[in-house]
Amino acid sequence: MKILLSCLSFREFTGSELYFYELSSAFQKAGHDVSLYSPFVDLPLKDKTSGITFPSRDDIDKESYDLLIFSHGSVTWNYIKNVNAKKIINVVHSEVLDLEQPIQSEKIDLYVGIRPSIVNYIVDKIGSSNKPVKLIYNPFDTSRFNPQRGKKKKSIKDKIVLFPGSLDYLRYQPLKYLLDLSEKQNFKVLHVGRNDYTTVHPNFTTQEPVWEVEQYYKQCDIVSGIFLGRTSIEGLLCGKKVLQFDVDKEGKIKKVYWHQ
Protein backbone atom coordinates (compact mmCIF):
# COMPACT_ATOMS: atom_id res chain seq x y z
CA MET A 1 0.00 0.00 0.00
CA LYS A 2 0.98 3.59 -0.54
CA ILE A 3 0.49 5.32 2.82
CA LEU A 4 0.63 8.98 3.84
CA LEU A 5 0.92 9.92 7.51
CA SER A 6 0.48 13.50 8.71
CA CYS A 7 1.03 15.23 12.04
CA LEU A 8 1.80 18.75 13.23
CA SER A 9 5.41 18.10 14.22
CA PHE A 10 7.95 15.34 13.69
CA ARG A 11 11.14 16.31 15.48
CA GLU A 12 11.09 15.55 19.25
CA PHE A 13 11.13 12.41 21.38
CA THR A 14 7.66 12.98 22.78
CA GLY A 15 4.06 11.71 22.71
CA SER A 16 2.30 11.92 19.38
CA GLU A 17 5.55 12.44 17.47
CA LEU A 18 6.82 9.08 18.72
CA TYR A 19 3.42 7.61 17.82
CA PHE A 20 4.00 8.53 14.19
CA TYR A 21 7.58 7.27 14.36
CA GLU A 22 6.41 3.86 15.59
CA LEU A 23 3.55 3.78 13.07
CA SER A 24 5.72 4.74 10.10
CA SER A 25 8.41 2.23 11.11
CA ALA A 26 5.89 -0.61 11.45
CA PHE A 27 4.31 0.13 8.06
CA GLN A 28 7.72 0.39 6.40
CA LYS A 29 8.91 -2.91 7.90
CA ALA A 30 5.70 -4.54 6.64
CA GLY A 31 6.69 -3.58 3.10
CA HIS A 32 4.49 -0.55 2.51
CA ASP A 33 5.50 2.65 0.72
CA VAL A 34 5.37 5.21 3.56
CA SER A 35 5.51 9.00 3.39
CA LEU A 36 5.08 11.45 6.25
CA TYR A 37 3.99 15.04 5.80
CA SER A 38 4.45 17.56 8.59
CA PRO A 39 5.03 21.32 8.48
CA PHE A 40 7.75 20.82 11.11
CA VAL A 41 10.21 18.00 10.38
CA ASP A 42 13.63 18.15 11.99
CA LEU A 43 16.29 16.43 14.06
CA PRO A 44 16.61 14.50 16.25
CA LEU A 45 13.55 12.36 15.43
CA LYS A 46 13.97 12.51 11.65
CA ASP A 47 17.39 10.90 11.99
CA LYS A 48 15.82 7.82 13.61
CA THR A 49 13.73 6.99 10.54
CA SER A 50 14.73 4.64 7.75
CA GLY A 51 13.05 4.24 4.39
CA ILE A 52 10.46 6.96 5.06
CA THR A 53 10.05 9.88 2.64
CA PHE A 54 9.09 13.42 3.66
CA PRO A 55 7.23 15.06 0.78
CA SER A 56 6.40 18.75 0.48
CA ARG A 57 2.86 20.08 0.58
CA ASP A 58 2.87 20.46 -3.20
CA ASP A 59 4.03 16.87 -3.58
CA ILE A 60 1.18 15.34 -1.56
CA ASP A 61 -1.45 17.13 -3.66
CA LYS A 62 -0.03 15.51 -6.80
CA GLU A 63 -0.01 11.94 -5.47
CA SER A 64 -2.67 9.29 -4.85
CA TYR A 65 -2.60 7.17 -1.70
CA ASP A 66 -4.29 4.01 -0.51
CA LEU A 67 -4.39 5.26 3.07
CA LEU A 68 -4.05 8.61 4.85
CA ILE A 69 -3.69 8.67 8.65
CA PHE A 70 -3.49 12.03 10.40
CA SER A 71 -3.64 13.75 13.78
CA HIS A 72 -3.70 17.35 15.07
CA GLY A 73 -6.49 18.02 12.61
CA SER A 74 -7.18 21.57 13.81
CA VAL A 75 -3.99 22.49 11.92
CA THR A 76 -3.07 19.62 9.61
CA TRP A 77 -6.46 19.22 7.94
CA ASN A 78 -5.94 22.49 6.08
CA TYR A 79 -2.81 20.98 4.51
CA ILE A 80 -4.18 17.54 3.63
CA LYS A 81 -7.91 17.94 3.00
CA ASN A 82 -7.45 17.82 -0.78
CA VAL A 83 -5.17 14.78 -0.78
CA ASN A 84 -6.44 11.94 -2.97
CA ALA A 85 -6.70 8.92 -0.64
CA LYS A 86 -8.90 5.83 -0.79
CA LYS A 87 -9.30 5.76 2.99
CA ILE A 88 -8.75 8.50 5.60
CA ILE A 89 -8.32 7.90 9.33
CA ASN A 90 -8.30 10.63 11.98
CA VAL A 91 -6.33 9.56 15.08
CA VAL A 92 -7.03 11.62 18.22
CA HIS A 93 -4.41 11.72 21.00
CA SER A 94 -6.04 13.99 23.58
CA GLU A 95 -9.44 14.83 25.01
CA VAL A 96 -8.30 18.19 26.43
CA LEU A 97 -6.30 19.85 23.63
CA ASP A 98 -8.18 21.96 21.06
CA LEU A 99 -5.50 20.92 18.55
CA GLU A 100 -6.84 17.37 18.74
CA GLN A 101 -10.53 17.95 18.05
CA PRO A 102 -11.81 15.33 15.59
CA ILE A 103 -12.39 16.63 12.08
CA GLN A 104 -16.01 16.38 11.01
CA SER A 105 -15.96 15.69 7.29
CA GLU A 106 -17.58 13.20 4.94
CA LYS A 107 -14.07 12.39 3.75
CA ILE A 108 -13.19 10.75 7.08
CA ASP A 109 -13.73 6.97 7.04
CA LEU A 110 -12.68 6.11 10.60
CA TYR A 111 -11.86 7.79 13.90
CA VAL A 112 -9.34 6.27 16.31
CA GLY A 113 -8.87 7.15 19.98
CA ILE A 114 -5.74 5.96 21.79
CA ARG A 115 -7.54 5.41 25.12
CA PRO A 116 -11.15 4.81 26.20
CA SER A 117 -11.74 8.37 27.43
CA ILE A 118 -10.75 9.73 24.00
CA VAL A 119 -13.15 7.35 22.27
CA ASN A 120 -15.94 8.80 24.43
CA TYR A 121 -14.73 12.32 23.59
CA ILE A 122 -14.83 11.59 19.85
CA VAL A 123 -18.33 10.13 20.05
CA ASP A 124 -19.54 13.23 21.91
CA LYS A 125 -17.93 15.54 19.34
CA ILE A 126 -19.10 13.88 16.14
CA GLY A 127 -22.64 13.44 17.46
CA SER A 128 -25.00 11.63 15.15
CA SER A 129 -22.34 10.82 12.55
CA ASN A 130 -22.47 7.20 11.47
CA LYS A 131 -18.69 7.00 11.04
CA PRO A 132 -17.03 4.22 13.09
CA VAL A 133 -14.87 5.02 16.13
CA LYS A 134 -12.26 2.51 17.34
CA LEU A 135 -10.02 2.19 20.38
CA ILE A 136 -6.43 1.43 19.34
CA TYR A 137 -3.73 2.00 21.95
CA ASN A 138 -0.35 3.56 21.20
CA PRO A 139 2.10 1.29 19.33
CA PHE A 140 5.18 0.27 21.33
CA ASP A 141 8.47 -1.52 20.78
CA THR A 142 8.23 -4.29 23.38
CA SER A 143 11.86 -5.26 22.77
CA ARG A 144 12.71 -1.95 24.47
CA PHE A 145 9.94 -1.79 27.07
CA ASN A 146 9.53 -5.02 29.02
CA PRO A 147 9.95 -6.20 32.65
CA GLN A 148 13.47 -7.55 32.09
CA ARG A 149 14.84 -4.34 30.55
CA GLY A 150 12.94 -2.22 33.07
CA LYS A 151 14.21 -4.02 36.17
CA LYS A 152 15.59 -1.55 38.70
CA LYS A 153 19.34 -1.53 39.23
CA LYS A 154 20.32 -2.90 42.64
CA SER A 155 22.88 -0.11 43.03
CA ILE A 156 20.10 2.52 43.23
CA LYS A 157 18.90 2.70 46.83
CA ASP A 158 16.65 5.80 46.71
CA LYS A 159 12.95 5.35 46.08
CA ILE A 160 12.37 7.09 42.75
CA VAL A 161 9.22 8.15 40.90
CA LEU A 162 9.88 8.63 37.19
CA PHE A 163 7.82 11.43 35.63
CA PRO A 164 8.51 11.35 31.86
CA GLY A 165 7.07 13.64 29.20
CA SER A 166 7.03 17.31 28.26
CA LEU A 167 6.67 19.33 31.45
CA ASP A 168 4.05 21.79 30.21
CA TYR A 169 0.93 23.31 31.75
CA LEU A 170 -0.87 19.95 31.69
CA ARG A 171 1.81 18.26 33.82
CA TYR A 172 2.72 21.14 36.15
CA GLN A 173 0.03 20.51 38.80
CA PRO A 174 0.73 16.75 38.87
CA LEU A 175 4.42 17.55 39.41
CA LYS A 176 3.56 19.82 42.34
CA TYR A 177 1.37 17.04 43.76
CA LEU A 178 4.26 14.58 43.52
CA LEU A 179 6.76 16.95 45.11
CA ASP A 180 4.42 17.70 48.02
CA LEU A 181 3.91 13.96 48.50
CA SER A 182 7.66 13.31 48.28
CA GLU A 183 8.22 15.37 51.44
CA LYS A 184 5.84 13.13 53.39
CA GLN A 185 6.83 9.78 51.90
CA ASN A 186 10.56 10.33 51.29
CA PHE A 187 11.07 9.69 47.58
CA LYS A 188 12.77 11.43 44.66
CA VAL A 189 11.03 12.67 41.50
CA LEU A 190 12.99 12.22 38.27
CA HIS A 191 11.63 14.07 35.24
CA VAL A 192 12.80 13.27 31.71
CA GLY A 193 11.70 15.44 28.80
CA ARG A 194 11.22 19.02 27.70
CA ASN A 195 10.86 21.34 30.70
CA ASP A 196 8.91 24.60 30.38
CA TYR A 197 9.33 25.54 34.05
CA THR A 198 12.09 26.34 36.50
CA THR A 199 11.44 24.06 39.45
CA VAL A 200 13.76 24.00 42.43
CA HIS A 201 13.11 21.30 45.02
CA PRO A 202 15.50 19.01 46.95
CA ASN A 203 13.63 15.92 45.75
CA PHE A 204 13.45 16.95 42.08
CA THR A 205 15.81 16.23 39.18
CA THR A 206 15.15 16.91 35.51
CA GLN A 207 16.90 15.47 32.45
CA GLU A 208 16.78 16.41 28.78
CA PRO A 209 14.66 14.24 26.45
CA VAL A 210 16.61 11.25 25.15
CA TRP A 211 15.95 8.42 22.73
CA GLU A 212 17.11 5.75 25.17
CA VAL A 213 14.45 6.67 27.75
CA GLU A 214 14.28 3.04 28.91
CA GLN A 215 17.52 3.62 30.85
CA TYR A 216 15.48 5.71 33.29
CA TYR A 217 12.93 2.97 33.83
CA LYS A 218 15.83 0.97 35.29
CA GLN A 219 16.29 3.68 37.91
CA CYS A 220 12.74 3.96 39.21
CA ASP A 221 10.23 2.16 41.41
CA ILE A 222 7.10 3.94 40.18
CA VAL A 223 6.17 5.72 36.94
CA SER A 224 3.79 8.67 36.92
CA GLY A 225 2.07 10.47 34.06
CA ILE A 226 -1.11 12.11 32.82
CA PHE A 227 -3.89 9.99 31.36
CA LEU A 228 -3.29 6.52 29.97
CA GLY A 229 -0.75 7.74 27.46
CA ARG A 230 2.67 6.70 26.22
CA THR A 231 4.59 7.09 29.47
CA SER A 232 2.00 5.26 31.57
CA ILE A 233 1.92 2.30 29.19
CA GLU A 234 5.72 2.23 28.92
CA GLY A 235 5.81 1.98 32.71
CA LEU A 236 3.28 -0.86 32.74
CA LEU A 237 5.23 -2.71 30.03
CA CYS A 238 8.35 -2.39 32.20
CA GLY A 239 6.51 -3.95 35.13
CA LYS A 240 6.19 -0.75 37.16
CA LYS A 241 3.32 0.54 39.24
CA VAL A 242 1.90 3.62 37.56
CA LEU A 243 0.41 6.60 39.40
CA GLN A 244 -1.82 8.31 36.88
CA PHE A 245 -3.29 11.81 36.86
CA ASP A 246 -6.31 12.87 34.85
CA VAL A 247 -6.41 16.63 34.29
CA ASP A 248 -8.78 19.09 32.63
CA LYS A 249 -7.90 21.37 29.72
CA GLU A 250 -6.42 23.96 32.12
CA GLY A 251 -4.19 21.35 33.75
CA LYS A 252 -6.16 21.09 37.01
CA ILE A 253 -6.12 17.62 38.56
CA LYS A 254 -9.44 15.76 38.28
CA LYS A 255 -8.39 12.32 39.47
CA VAL A 256 -5.35 10.46 40.86
CA TYR A 257 -5.23 6.66 40.75
CA TRP A 258 -3.04 3.58 40.37
CA HIS A 259 -2.41 1.18 37.51
CA GLN A 260 -0.45 -1.97 38.30
Regions found by a protein language model. Give the residues of each.
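Short acidic alpha-helix that forms the nucleotide-activated donor recognition element
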Residues: 63, 209-220, 233, 237
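Conserved active-site histidine-acidic residue motif and adjacent donor-binding/catalytic loop
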Residues: 55, 194-197, 203-216, 228-230
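Short His-centered aromatic/hydrophobic patch
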Residues: 70-75, 92, 227-228
